[in-house]
A protein has these predicted regions:
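Short, hydrophobic transmembrane alpha-helix segments
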Residues: 2-14, 27-35, 56-57
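Outer-pore turret/helix-boundary of cation channels
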Residues: 7-8, 109-143
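Aromatic-anchored segments of alpha-helical transmembrane domains
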Residues: 2-4, 45-53, 108
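Pore-domain transmembrane helices of cation channels
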Residues: 77-123
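Cytoplasmic-side transmembrane-helix entry/capping segments in multi-pass membrane proteins
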Residues: 35-46, 63-71, 91-102
Length: 171
């Protein structure tokens, strides 16, 4: 739903940033481990500070670092979810939701990694798209990430750089 809202709405980038930060904020409370809570809170605080710097009235932007912190936070959530998923042998609705959550976190991580690849190299995806190097590109990155996770791809968008191709094979 978010990519559709981002493409149609004039406030899609703001909504994307609010939702991404709220996911990372809610993840702080998804474990009972004190050290995981601390690491998650630190990563969230750094991510929030970097976003405020970028959207504030100053000339500085740490776009790549923001996404690297987002990837680190996503990896932490994957670790937390996998620990919860395999803690016992009981199959329940919570276990199924947890498995879907892991899958969606992999898609989010893939999209964030594509943003880093594009920001660092200037080339990531090709096809019938125009990438601007801004948050608006998330629509294409999450689409490619989800399609690569669920199928072998539709062929309308494809990886063109070596790092993006390696990521596509990982997904």
């Amino acid at each position: 739903v978010l990519p559709v809202i981002m493409e149609i709405s004039g406030h899609g980038v703001l909504l994307f940033n609010i939702l991404l930060l709220s996911v990372f904020f809610s993840g702080i409370f998804s474990t009972r481990s004190v050290w995981l809570i601390a690491v998650s809170a630190i990563l969230f605080s750094i991510h929030l500070a970097l976003r405020l710097i970028r959207f504030g009235e100053n000339p500085y932007s740490f776009f790549v670092l923001e996404n690297v912190i987002g990837i680190a936070n996503t990896l932490l959530f994957l670790f937390i979810n996998l620990r919860l998923l395999f803690r016992d042998q009981i199959v329940s609705a919570y276990r199924i939701v947890g498995a879907v959550n892991v899958y969606l976190l992999l898609a989010l991580m893939g999209a964030l990694m594509l943003e880093v690849i594009h920001a660092a190299t200037g080339v990531s995806l090709g096809g019938n798209i125009v990438l601007s190097g801004k948050d608006d590109d998330y629509v294409h990155f999450i689409y490619f990430s989800l399609v690569s996770l669920t199928t072998v791809g539709f062929g309308d968008i494809y990886a063109v750089s070596a790092p993006a191709k390696m990521l596509a094979t990982l997904l």
